[in-house]
Regions:
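Core of compact, soluble alpha-helical bundle domains
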Residues: 1-139
Length: 139
């Protein structure tokens, strides 16, 4: 994997739009080269610029309650070919790693609590079927 330049946010610094932008850029740089996630994301996203902008707005809305994101995450992920439930732990692990590289422990934990809740909601929306055991590993 290529070296990813990361400017760390000072632990005493407040969470800002700029810091969220650095997180999004650093995280998706890792996703794009990840052996499991890269093929799925790279085939689904033709132009990374708009996607990164959308993700900055999304995380700004989640963490700063800015209201900048105006999309539907479930609908967006329903259109992604190759998305599988077993990719979520890898996504969460990379996200956690990136948050801990950039932020104080408290801010990283706040991001990760939100990310885990979002992942759980997405998994439920994308993969739950009333006629099957949930979670699927309960079969």
């Amino acid at each position: 994997m290529s070296e990813i330049a990361i400017r760390t946010v000072r632990p005493e610094a407040a969470l800002t739009e700029e810091a969220i932008g650095r997180l999004v850029d650093a995280f998706y740089a890792k996703v794009r080269v990840d052996p499991a996630l890269g093929p799925v994301f790279n085939s689904a996203i033709a132009d990374w610029g708009p996607h990164l902008d959308t993700m900055r707005k999304f995380w700004s809305s989640v963490m700063l309650t800015s209201g900048r994101y105006k999309g539907n995450p479930v609908a967006a992920h329903q259109r992604v070919p190759g998305i599988q439930m077993d990719l979520f732990p890898r996504w969460l692990a990379l996200f956690d790693q990136t948050c801990r590289e950039l932020f104080s422990a408290d801010i990283a934990e706040a991001f990760n609590v939100k990310a885990n809740r979002i992942a759980e909601s997405l998994q439920f929306a994308l993969f739950y079927r009333p006629d099957r055991p949930w979670p699927p590993s309960a079969a």
